[in-house]
C-alpha cells in the first residue's frame, strides 16, 4: 500500500517538474508575478513599485541588488513588530546566522517560506 502511494506521489512530482522544464521562462514569469502581487502592499513593495512591474526587465530596473546591510533597516522594523515590511504580515521566526563574514544576521522566515523549504526537502527525497 505504501509503495502504491509513493509511486502516485512520485509520478505527480515528475509531471510537475516536467511542466517546469517544458516552460521555464513562463514558469519563472508566473512565479515572479505571484511574488510581486503578494508583496505589492509591503513597505519594500511600495517603495519599489511592485504593483506596476510586469516583466523581469522592469523588476531589474526598479529593484537594485542589495546586501544584508541594505536590508538591515527593514529587518529592524520587522523585529520591532511592524507588519508588512518585506513580506505581508509578520514572520513566524527569525533565523540567526553564524555571522562568519560580518557578525550575526537575523533572517525573517515566513510560514510560507518554511512550508516551501519543507516541500522542497520532501520532493528531493
Identify the residue ranges that each predicted region occupies.
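Nucleotide 5′-phosphate-binding alpha/beta core
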Residues: 1-96, 102-125
Amino acid at each position: 500500500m505504501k509503495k502504491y502511494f509513493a509511486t502516485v506521489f512520485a509520478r505527480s512530482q515528475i509531471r510537475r517538474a516536467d511542466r517546469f522544464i517544458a516552460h521555464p521562462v513562463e514558469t519563472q514569469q508566473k512565479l515572479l508575478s505571484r511574488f510581486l502581487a503578494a508583496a505589492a502592499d509591503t513597505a519594500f513593495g511600495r517603495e519599489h513599485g511592485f504593483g506596476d512591474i510586469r516583466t523581469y526587465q522592469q523588476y531589474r530596473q526598479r529593484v537594485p541588488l542589495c546586501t544584508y546591510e541594505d536590508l538591515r533597516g527593514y529587518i529592524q522594523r520587522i523585529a520591532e513588530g511592524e507588519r508588512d515590511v518585506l513580506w505581508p504580515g509578520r514572520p513566524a521566526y527569525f533565523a540567526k546566522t553564524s555571522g562568519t563574514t560580518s557578525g550575526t544576521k537575523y533572517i525573517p522566515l515566513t510560514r510560507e517560506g518554511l512550508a516551501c523549504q519543507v516541500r522542497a526537502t520532501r520532493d528531493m527525497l
